[in-house]
Swiss-Prot record:
An example Gene Ontology CC term for this record: chloroplast thylakoid membrane
Organism: Rhodomonas salina
Location within or outside the cell: Plastid, Chloroplast thylakoid membrane
Function in brief: Required during biogenesis of c-type cytochromes (cytochrome c6 and cytochrome f) at the step of heme attachment.
Quaternary context: May interact with CcsA.
Gene encoding the protein: ccs1
An annotated GO BP: cytochrome complex assembly
Membrane topology summary: Multi-pass membrane protein
Protein's UniProt name: Cytochrome c biogenesis protein Ccs1
Membrane spanning stretches: 19-39, 78-98, 164-184
Family from the record: Belongs to the Ccs1/CcsB family.
Assigned keywords, A-Z: Chloroplast, Cytochrome c-type biogenesis, Membrane, Plastid, Thylakoid, Transmembrane, Transmembrane helix
Length: 441
């Protein structure tokens, strides 16, 4: 029974470790990843129905129904994409067990040839008449070869790290795949729009894995938000002073974040991604304080604007006039328009203006910062995998070279081979043999 199980295991390892299977799996992952790049991910159903109408499928087959049925709207979290990653990892592991590790073990064995006819079949062969086996061994040792001499036979090798390289390549790829899979299953992405002075929890989740956990034992606090402008008046950078508070309200981490400079806390990364203006604080007749909500409008070719409507009583007409307040940025300049879109005035924050006999002053512009909050436990594994991959590339430059020799009467038969840089190896060995002949003549 155990023999049959062992045979089945070896056969399975042989099939899964097939190079063609690994290449097919890798190409499939690359193809579906390309689909994930082309097809917008994690959008609502209406988006796909509008972008990929069922009545007119793209390329004749890519419709909203097909995308949703196959999970192409969320490729990286589908069961079949996860299965492909697992199969590729198993294939690489099987190849390592079936081919790379046995190859390394063979490289460490002492492989003596006992007949000069066998040496001649290797390819690069020499017959030396004027030197001894011990002199050859000394010369090889000075060239960093590991030399084993047994009677009139000699075996030497160097460049064993070159045999370790392929194993590290497979190990690094498996670690990278594990990191990607871990991130898909247990990571999450949240987007929060938080007003200045606001406190927030992670709640607006836009993407999460089946095993993801969103911690609620801390909260964020936006202490300040500001925008830096360049000389042309366009936005150069925007900054948020962000604090992390524990369950007792104590600050445990703080940092001024900006684009490409996030805050990190317990494996969660807070990125600065956007900003907006949410409210205007207004004082009327030095008595009434109100907050007007702002609506953002994108005008093609002109940029983004924020608009609020302020109803002001018109005593003469016994009606309310709607005054439109328009902002382009956080510089404090506010444009006031009548309901029929006539420009009434341009004021700054803190400046009084008379509207229909009422004293109106904008006391503050309340801005919001846009944060992307991301957790990806697989990232450290991906970094480790890529580091090992770079290390394996370095190791691959080591040529694994072997030299055999047999002393038969007065003739020393020498042969050698290498797995790469063959021309350079042939030059080195030929030079070595010529030196032996001339030195010990």
């Amino acid at each position: 029974m155990l023999i049959k199980i062992n045979q089945y295991f070896r056969k399975s390892i042989s099939v899964l470790g097939n190079l063609k299977l690994a290449i097919i799996l890798l190409l499939m992952l690359a193809l579906f990843s390309a689909f994930g790049t082309v097809i917008e991910q994690n959008q609502n159903v209406a988006f796909y129905e509008n972008s990929y109408p069922n009545s007119a499928p793209l390329f004749g087959f890519l419709s909203a129904n097909a995308i949703l049925f196959l999970g192409l709207n969320n490729i990286y979290q589908t069961w079949w994409f996860t299965t492909l990653i697992l199969l590729l990892a198993v294939s690489l592991f099987s190849c390592t067990l079936a081919r790379q590790i046995p190859s390394l073990k063979m490289a460490r064995l002492w492989q003596f040839y006992t007949k000069d006819q066998s040496l001649k079949k290797i390819g690069l062969s020499f017959n030396l008449q004027k030197t001894s086996l011990s002199k050859l061994a000394f010369t090889l040792k000075t060239d960093d070869y590991n030399v084993i001499q047994k009677g009139r036979f000699l075996y030497a090798y160097k460049g064993l790290p070159g045999k370790i390289g392929p194993i590290i390549v497979h190990a690094s790829l498996i670690i990278i795949l594990f990191g990607a899979l871990l991130g898909n299953l247990s990571g999450f992405v949240s987007q929060e729009l938080v007003p200045l002075g606001g406190v927030f929890h992670i709640q607006n989740i836009i993407n999460s894995g089946t095993l993801s956990y969103v911690p609620q034992n801390f909260e964020g606090y936006v202490k300040d938000f500001k925008i830096a402008y360049n000389d042309e008046g366009s936005i150069d950078q925007f900054y948020s002073d962000l604090s992390i508070l524990n369950s007792t309200g104590e600050e445990v981490r703080s940092k001024t974040i900006y684009v490409n400079e996030p805050l990190r806390y317990e494996g969660i990364v807070f990125y600065q991604t956007d900003w907006s203006i949410t409210n205007l604080a207004i004082n009327v007749d030095q008595q009434t304080n109100i907050q007007l909500p702002l609506k953002s409008i994108n005008v093609k070719g002109e940029g983004k604007f924020w608009i609020a409507s302020l109803p002001i009583a018109n005593v003469e007409k016994a009606t309310n006039d709607n005054i439109l307040l328009v902002l382009e940025d956080l510089t404090g300049k506010i444009l006031l328009y009548s309901s029929n879109q006539q420009l009434l005035a341009i004021v700054n924050v803190g400046e009084n203006i008379s509207l229909n006999g009422h004293s109106v002053k904008v006391t503050d512009i309340i801005s919001s910062t846009g944060l992307q909050i991301k957790s990806d436990p697989g990232i450290p594994f991906v970094y480790i995998g890529f580091f090992l991959l770079m290390l394996s590339i370095t190791l691959s430059y080591f040529s694994y070279s072997q030299v055999w020799a047999i002393k038969d009467n007065k003739t020393l038969y020498v042969s050698g081979r290498t797995n790469r840089a063959i021309y350079s190896f042939e030059q080195q060995i030929t030079k070595m043999m010529n030196k032996l002949n001339s030195t010990y003549a």
